[in-house]
């Protein structure tokens, strides 16, 4: 089994971290600094054409069919982004066709203890390589530079610093990424395709769970013994950083507990 603790960067045991280094993504060539990916072999134009063709071909495919194709097409240039919330079935699905796949976890420094526990369990029981993707600033450094509790004063800026920029830096070394987007989450995600072009990161984006419901996710996890975040069944159908997430009331949008009381509904990594 390949896990973060058994396959670190460098020598000796320890967690595999994406050190904050280097600048933005390129379209092809050597591995960008700050990414664990193998680098991009194809140009953005070639990847876009591939995404558009596959989007049509797999419009009505199953998650397994899409991921089998992706594993064959991209190999180690395929990464999974997992929040260790409602998407832990993703590493299980991808590992079934591509054992050892890199699973990117945005370690913001503000996670629920339950989320960190789920991350540790996934890295132990599944044949995947969990990579902690780190912001350039620690929480203490961010507090010193921007003032304490930036998340309460400017949540958009906090998400940009702790999620959007780190993920973009890490994805620059891959050609395709797998996400846990589901159409039922909210109106902004209603038209998510199984395979699509990511115009922000200039790469192929796969949403194999797009047509799944919350109940589908829980049922799959139960059938296959996949660890799930215990908060999911405790009133948190959508889980983000602890200071910005509350329980969802019956009848509310699944993401109503994220940034409650604000117009903000997305952290920015899917925009």
Indicate where each model-derived feature is located.
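Nucleotide-activated chemistry modules centered on ATP-dependent adenylation/adenylyltransferase
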Residues: 2-271
């Amino acid at each position: 089994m390949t896990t973060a603790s058994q396959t670190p960067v460098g020598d000796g045991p320890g967690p595999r971290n994406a050190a904050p280094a280097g600048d933005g993504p390129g379209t092809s060539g050597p591995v960008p600094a700050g990414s664990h990916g193998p680098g991009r072999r194809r140009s953005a134009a070639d990847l876009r054409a591939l995404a558009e063709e596959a989007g049509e071909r797999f419009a009505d495919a199953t998650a397994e069919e899409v991921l089998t194709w992706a594993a064959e097409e991209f190999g180690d240039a395929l990464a999974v982004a997992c929040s260790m919330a409602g998407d832990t079935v993703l590493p299980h699905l991808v590992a079934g066709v591509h054992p050892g796949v890199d699973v990117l976890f945005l370690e913001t420094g503000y996670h629920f203890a339950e989320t960190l526990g789920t991350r540790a369990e996934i890295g132990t029981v599944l044949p995947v390589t969990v990579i902690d993707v780190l912001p350039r600033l620690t929480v203490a450094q961010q507090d010193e530079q921007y003032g304490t509790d930036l998340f309460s004063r400017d949540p958009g800026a906090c998400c940009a610093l702790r999620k959007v920029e780190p993920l973009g830096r890490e994805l620059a070394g891959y050609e395709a990424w797998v996400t846990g987007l589901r159409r039922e989450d909210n109106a902004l995600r209603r038209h998510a395709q199984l395979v699509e072009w990511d115009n922000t990161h200039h790469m192929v984006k796969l949403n194999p769970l797009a047509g799944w419901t919350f109940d589908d996710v829980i049922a799959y996890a139960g059938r296959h013994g996949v660890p799930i975040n215990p908060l999911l069944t405790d009133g948190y159908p959508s889980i983000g950083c602890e200071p910005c997430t509350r329980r969802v009331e019956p009848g509310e949008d699944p993401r109503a507990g994220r940034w409650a009381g604000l117009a903000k509904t997305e952290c920015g990594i899917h925009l």
